[in-house]
């Protein structure tokens, strides 16, 4: 009897101990996986002698990482890792900067995807060294040696790692330049640990680096149908001098084409839903979002523009069974009855600009079975066709001094920027590169032109959703454009003027499939 009691006592004690251990493990796991910014967790991999750390600056949306580790090479790795589990295709991008001169030339920072957290795991990464070396490093098998494909970008500040199936692409650039890229097939698990890393290359040294403009981008499924299926949106602002970006608002649906009000109080953007396409105001001081009343005009597209004095807004709204894009005008405070400016009987009208004197609107019009640049007198509603070209002309915008109308045209075979006098005379080409350039937008001070550059492999008559695009900046007086934005977006990113009143920042939309509630 005593033996039975002792056995039961031991069994009960063991069960209690097991229960306590399980509770402790669950508590530790819950604490360990506390998210940092957009990531799930951070930790050392490979048990480096000195421990690493991450500090997240919520206001500036930056990550300051510290880490040691012997190396990330040969058959095993030691580094500090800020990761998130990601399944399927993705893009992770970041702006990077080492802190200090460093000790070892081969200190490393970058973006990595690994099967697991073991020191010898298969992986592919976008690796930037302390010297001039930048390379896509990879380990094809657990415990195998490490190999690399070098990318010809020296001391890049802009990097991204993209996965499509088992193809990994490392793209790198110095801010202002376009990407240079290399790719490699590496068979990793469908779900990987992916994120940012730092390695000092010396076990007794801790290095530090700052990662900014960090985004995890999940593209749409391969079978998505444009203009029927949408992924999520980030409403962002950017400093044009530094390239620093900040996400102000994210939504799981399609947000498009922000305007920045001249009083510096609001961003106005359109939001798509199954029944209505409405305009909303984002208050910059508080982050509050309110609907802009457009009355019966509740099928707005992304072509809406503020008057130069900021008192009025003109919009493009789909009308009737044919959903003809038609231009209306209303006070910036909203209206139940917007004033119709163009007739749906004339064909589609997609607004892009006011004249500086606020007396005319300039738009892309479908007239006489062609798409050309058209102006309309607001008072008389009289239209003037300014270009008469059989190919597509689009995206017109008046220069602030009123001397030119800039637009984009595919008449040379690729979409390039052009300009003409306000009466349509003296057409001349402005850009001459390999990209498909859309939507020129003047800074309020008239010194700069911002536009979006689509890749060369698209249909030049289209400006599709969900592509890797550049936001480029060109002196209005002429000169070489520079790349200031490395963006996943396209349609809806900057279709309309989006400059801050002081000409120092821009607003735009980028895209990613987003998790609800995050």
Summary of predicted features, one role per range:
Residues 23-25, 127, 199, 398:
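Generic recognition of cysteine residues
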Residues 1-32:
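Bacterial Sec-dependent N-terminal signal peptides
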Residues 26-27, 61, 469-471:
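Short beta-strand/loop turn elements enriched in aromatics
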